[in-house]
Amino acid sequence: MIETVTDLSRLRGIVADWRRQGLRVALVPTMGNLHAGHFSLVMLARHYADRVVSSVFVNPTQFGPHEDFRRYPRTPEADMRGLEHVGCDVLWLPSVETMYPLGTERTVRLFVPCVSDVLEGTFRPGHFEGVCTVVARLFNQVLPDVAVFGKKDYQQLVVIRQMVVDLAFPIEILGGCIVRESDGLAMSSRNQYLSMQERPQAAEIHRTLIAMRDAVMSGGVHADVEAEAVRRLEAAGFQVDYAVIRLSDLGEPIDGTVISPGIALVAARLGNTRLIDNLEF
């Protein structure tokens, strides 16, 4: 049976007891409003660890001034039931005061240069600073052997991997595959913001990513592939932030070279909802 923990000393006591038993510990950080994509990360964690802690914390420092922090969906009871069903051992529910004892304005912040400044970093300044700050705190609280993050937030995964290397966290970082709806739309807590009319349109992002991948693999010029992706998405009603081809480390590829492994990434708004997705190849 899952145990819900809100006290840091209690959490550390549980983890210390696991350590004394020689058990391997995994962490799955989330912001709640969990869906099948999140639960797949917990199931992946169970393959690599004996015990799994999942955190639910809507982190204020990773939201910009005009983003959806206050209206971000919070579903604690459903989250707990779902986590218990997939075998999570501890649900860690820290308060803002626990995560930021000096307040969010005075807190020490972490910044990963270069990879944090592009793509999402351009459109959401300060976002990855908030992500790294809260993830590092979760690492110090749980002291996991393994931490699992979803590949839908691919840039976040790259940023966290760099942070772990640079700060010498003794933690293995795993990326969980994107879980999709039947029409290809990547599962996301923000999908519920879509109207009934917008929901079918949203699947065009995945179809566009497939077209981008196929065009690149057929030798298409990257700039032309990206421009066609933007045109296609705009024709479907999206306001496009970016549609790009990158190397797996998010470096920019050189036209005419073989990209392997590579990735196509899209961020676009449909109505009031901002969606991100990617496709590795």
Swiss-Prot record:
GO terms for cellular component: cytosol. It catalyses: (R)-pantoate + beta-alanine + ATP = (R)-pantothenate + AMP + diphosphate + H(+). It is found in: Cytoplasm. The keyword Disulfide bond does not apply. ATP binds at residues 31-38, 150-153, 179, 187-190. Its EC number is 6.3.2.1. GO terms for biological process: pantothenate biosynthetic process. One of its GO terms (molecular function) is pantoate-beta-alanine ligase activity. Beta-alanine binds at residue 62. (R)-pantoate binds at residues 62, 156. Transmembrane segments: none annotated. Keywords: ATP-binding, Cytoplasm, Ligase, Nucleotide-binding, Pantothenate biosynthesis. Pathway: Cofactor biosynthesis; (R)-pantothenate biosynthesis; (R)-pantothenate from (R)-pantoate and beta-alanine: step 1/1. Pfam families: Pantoate_ligase (PF02569). Belongs to the pantothenate synthetase family. Catalyzes the condensation of pantoate with beta-alanine in an ATP-dependent reaction via a pantoyl-adenylate intermediate. NCBIfam families: panC. Homodimer. This is Pantothenate synthetase. The lineage of its organism: Bacteria, Pseudomonadati, Pseudomonadota, Gammaproteobacteria, Lysobacterales. The gene is panC.
